[in-house]
Each structure stands twice: as C-alpha cells, then as structure tokens.
C-alpha cells in the first residue's frame, strides 16, 4: 500500500515537470532561403560543428544567436542544445527573420551571417552570392 501511494505522486511529478518546459509552438517553415542557407552553412548536416566559432547544426548557430532569439521572445525558450535540432534551428531562424520586417532575402541572409548590421558589411556579400546560387537551384533537403 505504501508503494502505491508513492507511485502516484511520482507519476504526478513527471506529468507536471513536462509542462514546465516552455515550448515554442511555431510552425516549422522551411523554404528555399532556409534550404540554401543550410547548404552554405553545413551542407544540410545537422551534426555539423565548427569548434572555432562554436557554431552548431544545419544552420551553424552560435551561442550569441540563441541568446538573441531568446531576447526577441522575451523568455528563455531555446537552449544551446537546441542548435542540434533541425526543427528548432529553423524555428530560431524564422523568429529572427520575423523581426526583420520587410527585409529582402539578401538582407536576411547577410544579417544571418554578419549580425544586425550584416547587410552593410562588404564581406557578407560573398556569403549572399553563395546562398543566392542555391536559392536558384533545386536543393534536395536531407
């Protein structure tokens, strides 16, 4: 009898704990721009890791981008571990993109590469030209 009473609170705790996790319920939209950026950043490899920049996953997200997306949301919805998830990486990209209202694909890609002022940094033009090449081709997503 004592064991039965202990199992119920433990079960109840796990149900409650799963509700504490603050999920971002955004549709996962993957379009030509995202697919192209994934090809440039990682070749579409969700396990890609650049130790020099601590950039992770298919979109090569650095810790500063996770912090920025959480700042835009006003809460800590994403962790550094989420960078390994293709779906969560795309969500983070789409959140940043949604805050760049009216931006062209070029501005979005160059901002993704160089930060908020990236579209004005000459070095990000080469990045954009690579992305643009992929947006104009048929990319097979992994």
Region roles according to the model:
Residues 125:
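Active-site-proximal loop/helix of nucleotide/amide-processing enzymes and allied scaffolds
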Residues 46-47, 119-122:
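Extracytoplasmic/secreted cell-surface and envelope-processing proteins
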Residues 3-14:
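Sec-dependent N-terminal signal peptides
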Residues 63-120, 128-137:
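Alpha-helical segment that forms one wall of the substrate-binding/catalytic cleft
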Residues 19-27, 136-142:
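Extracytoplasmic and endomembrane cell-envelope/extracellular-matrix remodeling and assembly machinery
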């Amino acid at each position: 009898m004592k064991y039965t009473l202990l199992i119920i609170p433990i079960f109840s705790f796990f149900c409650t704990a799963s509700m504490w996790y603050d999920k971002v319920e955004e549709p996962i939209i993957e379009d030509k721009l995202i697919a192209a950026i994934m090809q440039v950043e990682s070749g579409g490899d969700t396990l890609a890791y650049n130790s020099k920049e601590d950039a992770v996953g298919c979109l090569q997200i650095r810790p500063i981008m996770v912090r920025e997306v959480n700042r835009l949301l006003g809460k800590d919805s994403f962790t550094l571990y989420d960078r390994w998830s293709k779906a969560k990486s795309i969500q983070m990209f789409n959140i940043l993109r949604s805050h760049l209202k009216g931006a062209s694909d070029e501005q979005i890609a160059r901002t993704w590469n160089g930060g908020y002022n990236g579209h004005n940094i000459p070095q990000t033009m080469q990045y954009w030209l690579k992305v643009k090449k992929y947006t104009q081709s048929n990319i097979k997503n992994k």
